[in-house]
C-alpha cells in the first residue's frame, strides 16, 4: 500500500444489526471510494458500542455482521486496513492519556453526550458515554491520520482531536499528526420514507420509513412504494415543498448515478406511482446482491476471522509505535523484558 498517500481513518458502530440506506450512502460508499486515493484504516468500533448497555451475544454477532457488511459493500482488505477496535488494545491505552489532558468543561460541551444522555437520563448515562469523544480522539491519533471523513454532526469531535493533539505536542514535543476533517462532499442526505422531515435512522418512530439493506427485497420494495409523498402529481426536486418526492429522487439518483434533472425529464407527465415502481426495482437490484455477499462472509467465518486478524495485525503495527512514543514522551518507565 502506497505510504505516500494521505492516511484516513473512520469507524462504524456494531449496534444496529443491518446497515440502513442512510449509513451506506452517507458514509460507507465514500469509504469504498477513499480506498483508491488514501491509506485507509476502517474499524468496527465495539469499544464505543459499550458506552451504552449491550447484550454480549448480540454485540459479538453484530460485530461480525458489521464487518461482513463492510466487505459486502466493497471494502477490500488488500486496499485498506479493516479491523475490530477491541483487537487493538492501544486504543484504550492512549485514550487514558487523552482523558488526562482533557478538561472536564471541554468534555461537558460535547453535544452528542448532551443528546444521548438526555435520552437516557443523566444519572443513567455512563462515564464511558461522557468520555466517548476522547476515545474517538485516541482512535484518530493512534494512526497519525491526516484526514477523518465526517459528516457535519461530527465536526466538533474533530476539533477536540485537533486541540488535544496540539496540546500534547506543545507539552511533550511533536508526537501526533494534527488531522483535518474530510467533510464528505456530495453526501446524499437520506430521509425517512414515512417522515421526510427527519433523517433516516433506526430510532425513528416506525420501521416503515427505514430501508435496512438486509431486509427481504420484497419488504424493501413495499416500503418504497408506500413512501409518503404530497398531493401534487408533478415529479420535480423541491426539498422545501416536496420533501417526499425529493427524497425518492435523491435515492434514485445516488444509487444509479443518474442526475436529478435527467430523472425529472424522464418522469415528465408520469405519476408518482411510476417513479416509486422504478425506484423499488432499483432498490431490489441493489440490496439482493448486497445481502448475498454479506451472507457469504457470515457462512465462511474462518475467512472473515482471518481478514479481521490480518487487519488488526496491520493496525497494531502502527498503533503500537505511536503508543510507545506517547508513553516515552509522557515519562512512563519502560517495561524491561
UniProtKB/Swiss-Prot annotation:
GO cellular component, one term: cytosol
Reactions accelerated catalytically: tRNA(Trp) + L-tryptophan + ATP = L-tryptophyl-tRNA(Trp) + AMP + diphosphate + H(+)
Binding site for ATP: 13-15, 22-23, 151-153, 190, 199-203
Keywords: Aminoacyl-tRNA synthetase, ATP-binding, Cytoplasm, Ligase, Nucleotide-binding, Protein biosynthesis
Gene3D superfamilies assigned: HUPs, Tyrosyl-Transfer RNA Synthetase
Stated role: Catalyzes the attachment of tryptophan to tRNA(Trp).
Entries under PANTHER family matching the protein: TRYPTOPHAN--TRNA LIGASE, MITOCHONDRIAL (PTHR43766:SF1)
Quaternary structure and interacting proteins, as annotated: Homodimer.
UniProt-listed HAMAP family: Trp_tRNA_synth_B
Protein name as it appears in the record: Tryptophan--tRNA ligase 2
Organism, as annotated: Streptomyces avermitilis (strain ATCC 31267 / DSM 46492 / JCM 5070 / NBRC 14893 / NCIMB 12804 / NRRL 8165 / MA-4680)
Amino acid at each position: 500500500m502506497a505510504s505516500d498517500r494521505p492516511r484516513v481513518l473512520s469507524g462504524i458502530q456494531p449496534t444496529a444489526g443491518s446497515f440502513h440506506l442512510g449509513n451506506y450512502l452517507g458514509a460507507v460508499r465514500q469509504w469504498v471510494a477513499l480506498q483508491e486515493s488514501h491509506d485507509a484504516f476502517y474499524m468496527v468500533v465495539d469499544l464505543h458500542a459499550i458506552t451504552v448497555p449491550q447484550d454480549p451475544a448480540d454485540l459479538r454477532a453484530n460485530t461480525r455482521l458489521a464487518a461482513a457488511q463492510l466487505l459486502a459493500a466493497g471494502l477490500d482488505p488488500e486496499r485498506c486496513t479493516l479491523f475490530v477496535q477491541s483487537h487493538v488494545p492501544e486504543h484504550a491505552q492512549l485514550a487514558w492519556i487523552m482523558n488526562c489532558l482533557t478538561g472536564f468543561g471541554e468534555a461537558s460541551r460535547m453535544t452528542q453526550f448532551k443528546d444521548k444522555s438526555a435520552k437516557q437520563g443523566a444519572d443513567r448515562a455512563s462515564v464511558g458515554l461522557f468520555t466517548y469523544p476522547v476515545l474517538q480522539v485516541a482512535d484518530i491519533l493512534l494512526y497519525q491520520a491526516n484526514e477523518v471523513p465526517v459528516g457535519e454532526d461530527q465536526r466538533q469531535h474533530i476539533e477536540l482531536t485537533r486541540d488535544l493533539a496540539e496540546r500534547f505536542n506543545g507539552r511533550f514535543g511533536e508526537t501526533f499528526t494534527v488531522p483535518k476533517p474530510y467533510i464528505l462532499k456530495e453526501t446524499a442526505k437520506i430521509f425517512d420514507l414515512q417522515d421526510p422531515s427527519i433523517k433516516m435512522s433506526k430510532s425513528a418512530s416506525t420501521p416503515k420509513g427505514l430501508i435496512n439493506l438486509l431486509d427481504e427485497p420484497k419488504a424493501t420494495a413495499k416500503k418504497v412504494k408506500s413512501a409518503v409523498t404530497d398531493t401534487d402529481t408533478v415529479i420535480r426536486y423541491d426539498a422545501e415543498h416536496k420533501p417526499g418526492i425529493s427524497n425518492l429522487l435523491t435515492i434514485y439518483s445516488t444509487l444509479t448515478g443518474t442526475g436529478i434533472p435527467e430523472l425529472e425529464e424522464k418522469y415528465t407527465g408520469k405519476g408518482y406511482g411510476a417513479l416509486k415502481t422504478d425506484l423499488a426495482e432499483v432498490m431490489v437490484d441493489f440490496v439482493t446482491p448486497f445481502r448475498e455477499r454479506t451472507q457469504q462472509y457470515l457462512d465462511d467465518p474462518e475467512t472473515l476471522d482471518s481478514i479481521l486478524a490480518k487487519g488488526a495485525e496491520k493496525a497494531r503495527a502502527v498503533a503500537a509505535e505511536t503508543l510507545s512514543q506517547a508513553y516515552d514522551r509522557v515519562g512512563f518507565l519502560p517495561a524491561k523484558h
